[in-house]
């Protein structure tokens, strides 16, 4: 049974030591977090007026990359949005942007007006474009649920892991020699496996580096669309669903093969 010990935690970041899990499971979780988590992102932009120096296409591209808060608990499951089971209006949020410059102004992400107060830019101070006197931007933008496997603008978080290193210092002079790389050679949370290997190159046989089998340091960092706890819960839900679909398909295949033999 895998054991998890959380060693660092904030609303948007989590680092944990995972022990007793196969690499395939840990890597599957990492891949789901990176490419499968559903988030809102602007996907369609209707430009009514744009007299700024920025092309409409570049303006739309910038809007798409603005991270938006995504209240999963009040949105349909991403699978229903993708399959058409959910009402399209429930999977889409409309934004408007209207700025008329009386002088030199910077248009920020906070100037976007959402029809839903719970789906708004994560950060209000992301610059979009600068306007000078007489210039204006008027547009409508539509955000929808999506996954990062379709486009990077739908990426909700980063995740990675490394094998838990086992370091044996055979000469104390090696600690000082490696201080710039690792302040504490024997602390696996500070001195990653790659850093330990770099120190081994500096110290030679005065430092022995190995790793714990089926033990890892795993970390997740959210971009702010939702907190890291929500990201992990959703990742496990998606992973569990994938396993269920696979087992169902395997059972049907086995049943068909058995009937064919009869």
Swiss-Prot record:
Keywords from the named record: Cytoplasm, DNA-directed RNA polymerase, Nucleotidyltransferase, Transcription, Transferase
EC number in record: 2.7.7.6
Compartment(s) of residence: Cytoplasm
Entry GO terms, CC: cytoplasm; DNA-directed RNA polymerase complex
Keyword Cytoplasm assigned: yes
Role played: DNA-dependent RNA polymerase (RNAP) catalyzes the transcription of DNA into RNA using the four ribonucleoside triphosphates as substrates.
Family annotation (PANTHER family): DNA-DIRECTED RNA POLYMERASE, DNA-DIRECTED RNA POLYMERASE II SUBUNIT RPB3
Official protein name in the record: DNA-directed RNA polymerase subunit Rpo3
Naturally occurring in which organism (per UniProt): Pyrobaculum neutrophilum (strain DSM 2338 / JCM 9278 / NBRC 100436 / V24Sta)
Organismal lineage: Archaea, Thermoproteota, Thermoprotei, Thermoproteales, Thermoproteaceae
Name of the coding gene: rpo3
